[in-house]
């Protein structure tokens, strides 16, 4: 890398060769190569129409390709079972009649991985396969069964690759060429068993995380959005059923701890008509807590659930050590200090289900126009079963010996 230092007085110095008027910023629109597009659609249609039980899986690059609507059109036209990768949750409507949940290998929504991995053809639209999304590279997928559609490139069955083909154009054209085939969804529907519910809490019993998320589920509507912090909230928020119009943000490309505090600030500022519900662990919050100050200055009405379990729980499952136990803070006291009597802010600390119900009622009632900070005290070992499975697999992948090649 090279750094060029320029004196602060130099950029404004005029010169006769410079245009006096500002040059308008514009990006030339990208266009598909028509011959490549037609060839890619022809090859994909031939491949998928021969399959017995094909499926569709949406990935996070649907957003950058602006192809979510085209992907849903393809699902409507084809009748294929429809799943999403974890970081694409919220980009595909979960009320779609053929939606089968999140495909995340061993920690997928119940019955979803079995349907996807047993399919004889799968189309992935905008996937990212890294150690986290592949659960330590343990996905049971075969490249020769897959069509990989990237924002400007299509690869058919690990063979022919077609460049300069935009995802949006490809999916729309492919929808017109596929035969209707709902075998995979029918198989899913046949074996599906609804989720169970958490055990009922005894009076004043210490709050369990699965009980807390049962109550968060009831808060969701088209007027809310969920921000899931890196950590166990990844897995608990994945299991939330998003109503139509409910926003959702989830970052796992880098596993960035603390990202959700700033993301909550930005989302609430960009979409003021929605009430943001952020689920943040105590370890993550310590990294970026100061962003709450700007939330208050901007008059945001976010609900933050600070899940205090005394450490970096996700890191414990990947690689445990004394560094994963953190100094406990008085989190509500910290937010009260940041509030400092300016703006609308309400904080509380809850230890049991009764207190949680009361806090949610207050946050969605009398304090609905305030930033609400609810610190939830839970046991340090209270994790989702998905984190236990995922952590074991990622830990094994991370600790494997280096490849000599």
UniProtKB/Swiss-Prot annotation:
The keyword Transcription does not apply. Its EC number is 4.1.1.1. One of its GO terms (cellular component) is cytosol. Keywords: Decarboxylase, Lyase, Magnesium, Metal-binding, Thiamine pyrophosphate. It holds the Pfam family TPP_enzyme_M. Gene3D superfamilies: 3.40.50.970, TPP-binding domain. It is an enzyme of class 4 (lyase). Signal peptide: none annotated. InterPro entries: DHS-like_NAD/FAD-binding_dom, PDC/IPDC-like, THDP-binding, Thiamin_PyroP_enz_cen_dom, TPP_enzyme_TPP-bd, TPP_PDC_IPDC. Substrate binds at residue 315. Belongs to the TPP enzyme family. This is Pyruvate decarboxylase 2. It comes from Pisum sativum.
